[in-house]
A protein has these predicted regions:
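Tandem repeat scaffolds
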Residues: 1-120
């Protein structure tokens, strides 16, 4: 488990991620097209990061905030649904999918939600 770390301008596109991040902040990081599997993010913040087309196979997001991030084409329906909780502020979620997910406590503030799939 990695705790209380700040990552700035790090490229995670080819980096193998740890299994769990707790109270970490990712700023100006690139995850575009990365394969993030079986990773847990607890109380983390993503600020101005590119996560477009990232594959989230069984990834857990527990109380995670995304601020000014690109998340285009991300299939959140591949996430681990146990305690799933995240919020989005000023993010681009064009073509993202939350298909069959229960996201009642999720907020989308000033986000681009063009063609996002919220079908339940």
């Amino acid at each position: 488990m990695i705790e209380n770390q700040n990552y700035i301008k790090k490229d995670f596109t080819t980096t193998k991620l740890a299994q769990q991040y707790d109270c970490c902040t990712f700023t100006d990081c690139n995850f575009e097209n990365a394969k993030i599997g079986n990773t847990t993010f607890m109380e983390c913040k993503f600020v101005n990061c590119n996560l477009s087309n990232t594959q989230l196979n069984v990834t857990s997001f527990k109380d995670v905030n995304f601020n000014t991030c690109k998340l285009m084409g991300v299939n959140f329906n591949d996430c681990n649904t146990f305690l799933l909780q995240f919020n989005f502020n000023n993010c681009d979620l064009t073509l993202a999918s939350f298909y069959q997910l229960t996201i009642k406590n999720t907020s989308f503030i000033s986000c681009n939600l063009t063609e996002v799939d919220f079908y339940h």
